[in-house]
Amino acid sequence: MSKTHLTTEKFAQMGLEPEVLAGLESKGFHYCTPIQALSLPLLVEGHDLAGQAQTGTGKTIAFLAATFNYLLTHPLSNPRLVNQPRAIIMAPTRELAVQIYNDADTISASTGLKLGLAYGGEGYDKQLAVLEQGVDILIGTTGRIIDYFKSKVIDLSNIQVVVLDEADRMFDLGFIKDIRFLFRRMPAPTERLSMLFSATLSLRVQELAYEHMNHPEHVQIEPEQMTGIRIQEELFYPSNEDKMLLLLSLMEEEWPEKAIVFANTKHVCEDVHAWLENDGHRVGLLTGDVPQKKRMKILEDFTKGTLDILVATDVAARGLHIPDVTHVFNYDLPDDAEDYVHRIGRTGRAGKSGHSISLACEDYAFNLPAIEEYIHHPIPVSKYDREALLDDVTAPKRVVRNRQPVNRNMRDRQGGGNSNNRRRPPRKS
């Protein structure tokens, strides 16, 4: 683990219970990140907290350590029913809920606290069987949690800790009514520890915090550097005609070890995926229409390196802990300026450098002013040479293209990213 993103503060100095500390140290967590060093002392003292930090800075470990610690130091005075969890952690997506559960599982063994997972799309009966045995900490998405609540599988009247992760994404996905429904079934804010974490804390998120939390402390990490000091940003202005060929040309020039390509719609994602796959890249597709089991398999393959490129909608832009992403390509500039920050935050994590390349095409260039205003700096512009764009790629059968291709053999990426037939770069010097 790189130490460049850590502080000199140790978890052992945070006042955590020995069981929690043992769980953290067993997984190699000794030094705190900035968000952990600032938030844990407040949480250990019992203060509610609304924390803002860039993705990949350790928010998850911060709220998990605080949750386990609070439950160990605040035993219930009266016996609880088997269907009454003591803590609830809400996430906007299934993938994020699963990742939080996996992180929590590394700590739970040393604490004796039981975990439950609840998310939609699959596994209802399997999840139900675990919940019926009783859990201390319930992690999940709001829709499935509400399903279990209405079926009386769970009762929230003994909740001692509540965590809302990626709160602004909850608003974006329209889950705010679900969140308020669940909050109102829990004990009053003064009777529980509440945490809200997000990469951004918009006004609407702060209003939610004041509505359902007990005078929360606010913690922010590097708010002036919205996009991360280790991310090299770059912007091109392609015509719609050149856009796909520019992406393919840049992909060949950069030859990234691990890249995510973002587009604004699933249909465009499908087209981009088809072009990249047809061009010989090991590429996966992640959109809302992909079945849950396949989504998890794609993420697993991408994480372990079986896939080099992931094409995704913003469903993958928030919260997912995918290590070692070297490049992010914004094939479409996002409509929401905050999503630009979340997208490129997939790279440049854990003290490593990253590269973000955005294409401001004819359809989405108008999103650029709002993005640059939000991040407080202009994105450096690069020019490209149309004559240097790939002209020997074969279009996928179901995609109609404007420029006539010439057939060529697909490149082989099975060797892990070595290109033996490099073309002259499309960038103008």
UniProtKB/Swiss-Prot annotation:
Transit peptide among keywords: no
Catalysed reaction, written as an equation: ATP + H2O = ADP + phosphate + H(+)
Classification via CDD domains: DEADc (cd00268), SF2_C_DEAD (cd18787)
Keyword rRNA processing listed: no
Motif DEAD box mapped to chain: 165-168
Localization of this protein: Cytoplasm
Superkingdom assignment: Bacteria
Helicase C-terminal domain segment(s): 243-390
InterPro entries: DEAD/DEAH_box_helicase_dom, DEAD_box_RNA_helicase, Helicase_ATP-bd, Helicase_C-like, P-loop_NTPase, RNA-helicase_DEAD-box_CS, RNA_helicase_ATP-dep_RhlB, RNA_helicase_DEAD_Q_motif
Cross-referenced Pfam families: DEAD, Helicase_C
Broadest EC class assigned to this enzyme: hydrolase
GO molecular function: ATP binding; ATP hydrolysis activity; RNA binding; RNA helicase activity
UniProt family annotation: Belongs to the DEAD box helicase family. RhlB subfamily.
HAMAP family, per the entry: DEAD_helicase_RhlB (MF_00661)
Subunit structure comment from the entry: Component of the RNA degradosome, which is a multiprotein complex involved in RNA processing and mRNA degradation.
Free-text function comment from the UniProt entry: DEAD-box RNA helicase involved in RNA degradation. Has RNA-dependent ATPase activity and unwinds double-stranded RNA.
PANTHER family listed in its UniProt record: ATP-DEPENDENT RNA HELICASE RHLB, ATP-DEPENDENT RNA HELICASE RHLE-RELATED
Protein name: ATP-dependent RNA helicase RhlB
Annotated gene: rhlB
